[in-house]
């Protein structure tokens, strides 16, 4: 019986008990009764998002937030403010972009085209995943879609090469495909699902984050971390098996079908989205306007049909993110933001005076915290975003610095349960999946790569005035 008790069960019970104690005892002098009730509701929502008791979904946690907000009679404009965030209307089209890549076969075509130019060496094959990940990240921020496209191809490669299951070579190929689906797109706002999410959270806190802001703070460290991870993976997980030249030739002999009209149309639209987002300073259109226009084009040109509307978007995740966007206004309306700021801001004082100490201490804490917050790091970002202006006011640390730390730490994957896309990748790979030992080593390489990337990034951020 005791063996069947999981960490998730213990965590769920503890968080539920904390919420009950807060509602009954009202222990915080700086919070009134409504704030205590709302805080309890937030803790229950976080419990659902992190531990998923009774297999409850992300959307259910969002509905718990709405319920508690209505119970204490907050205005609907506060409770449901997340649904009016432009970032949400960037995210919804993003799901359609990913669905289009899968439906038309464009994503697989791009990936296979890159694999076919490889030489029969591990170095060539491993580095091939970088342009595949970058290309797919330009076309869609949906990491789930990129994983769904790239992992089956990686598995096919391992089978064609007849690599031993659980071997270093097998794990290296699968892990690299997963990592390149996850990490490179973090360098720009529309390359990862966190982009629209963080943009919305920051907007709720009165901070505007543009496409250019995101690239300025994250492109360099992400590029460095990506490159170092691939190189480190080759060194630490150096395969014992040789690759068969005949296997590469077998892949090259797979002749793809002629590119369809839908694929061509999709490619034009998706590239146009990226270019338009990159040149926003010239034409003045917001990312939300660009993405919604592109989504409409898919339907107008017949790439998507009405029946695709329900299939394309993950409405469970959309409701969750919309309600998470509402956390900032909920915090402000109930006074929780001020209360949290009174705890967090003084706690940062010992490290805030030195940019190097601040960045590395905060990054180390967030990497450790990622072992607890396994809900894509979204709950942590939701809690921190409303108090970042207070941190900036106290210590002149620009919120953009926090965004970089959130993203780098949020991608961590030391342990099997820690990263939802790692879990998804292992599921897709089946008996071809990497071993826990190989994942641990690869995750440690990523952590070290991020620290080295920050060594380069911190001087850039200092020169950019992000530390006052």
Where does each model-flagged region fall?
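Membrane-core helix-loop-helix motifs of multi-pass transport proteins
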Residues: 1-4, 156-239, 422-468
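Hydrophobic transmembrane alpha-helices of multi-pass small-molecule transporters
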Residues: 1-90, 216-342, 441-468
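Transmembrane alpha-helix interface/packing and boundary motifs in multi-pass membrane proteins
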Residues: 46-55, 132-142, 178-189, 276-282, ...
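Small-residue-rich segments of transmembrane alpha-helices in multi-pass membrane proteins
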Residues: 66-71, 122-127, 131, 177-183, ...
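Alpha-helical transmembrane segments
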Residues: 86-96, 140-145, 214-230, 399-413
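Membrane-embedded helical hairpins/re-entrant loop segments and their flanking transmembrane helices
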Residues: 106-135, 158-165
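Hydrophobic alpha-helical transmembrane segments of multi-pass integral membrane proteins
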Residues: 118-153, 351-408
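Re-entrant/interfacial helical elements at transmembrane boundaries that shape
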Residues: 144-159, 174, 188-204, 340-342, ...
């Amino acid at each position: 019986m005791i063996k069947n008790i999981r960490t998730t069960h213990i965590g769920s019970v503890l968080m539920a008990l904390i919420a009950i104690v807060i509602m009954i005892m009202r222990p915080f002098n700086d919070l009134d009764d409504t704030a205590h009730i709302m805080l309890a509701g937030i803790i229950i929502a976080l419990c659902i998002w992190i531990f998923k008791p009774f297999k409850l979904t992300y959307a259910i946690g969002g509905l718990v937030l709405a319920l508690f907000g209505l119970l204490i009679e907050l205005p609907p404009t506060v409770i449901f403010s997340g649904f009016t965030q432009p970032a949400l209307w960037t995210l919804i089209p993003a799901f359609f972009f990913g669905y289009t890549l899968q439906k038309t076969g464009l994503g697989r075509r791009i990936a296979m085209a890159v694999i076919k130019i490889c030489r029969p060496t591990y170095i060539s094959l491993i580095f091939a995943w970088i342009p595949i990940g970058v290309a797919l990240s330009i076309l869609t921020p949906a990491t789930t879609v990129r994983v769904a496209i790239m992992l089956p191809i990686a598995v096919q490669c391992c089978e064609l090469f007849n690599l031993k299951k659980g071997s270093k070579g097998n794990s290296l190929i699968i892990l690299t495909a997963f990592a390149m689906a996850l990490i490179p797109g973090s360098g720009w706002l529309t390359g990862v699902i966190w982009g629209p999410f963080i943009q919305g959270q920051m907007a709720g806190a009165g901070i505007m984050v543009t496409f250019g802001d995101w690239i300025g703070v994250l492109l360099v460290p992400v590029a460095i971390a990506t490159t170092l991870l691939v190189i480190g993976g080759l060194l630490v997980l150096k395969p014992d098996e040789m690759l068969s030249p005949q296997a590469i030739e077998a892949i090259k002999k797979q002749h793809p079908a002629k590119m369809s009209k839908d694929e061509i149309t999709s490619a034009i639209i998706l590239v146009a989205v990226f270019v338009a987002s990159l040149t926003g300073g010239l034409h003045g259109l917001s990312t939300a306007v660009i993405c919604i226009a592109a989504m409409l084009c898919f339907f107008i040109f017949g790439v998507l049909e009405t029946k695709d509307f329900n299939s394309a978007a993950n409405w469970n995740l959309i409701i969750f993110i919309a309600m998470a966007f509402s956390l900032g206004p909920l915090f402000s309306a109930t006074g929780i933001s001020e209360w949290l700021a009174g705890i967090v801001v003084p706690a940062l004082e010992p490290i805030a005076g030195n940019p190097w100490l601040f960045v590395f201490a905060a990054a180390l804490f967030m990497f450790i915290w990622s072992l607890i917050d396994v809900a894509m790091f979204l709950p942590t970002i939701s809690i921190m975003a409303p108090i970042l202006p207070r941190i900036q006011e106290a210590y002149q640390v620009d919120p953009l610095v926090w965004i970089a730390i959130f993203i780098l730490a949020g991608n961590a994957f030391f342990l099997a349960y820690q990263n939802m896309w790692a879990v998804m990748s292992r599921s897709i790979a089946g008996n071809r999946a990497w071993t826990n030992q190989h994942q641990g080593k690869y995750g440690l390489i990523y952590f070290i790569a991020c620290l080295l990337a920050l060594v380069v990034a911190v001087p850039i951020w200092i020169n950019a005035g992000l530390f006052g």
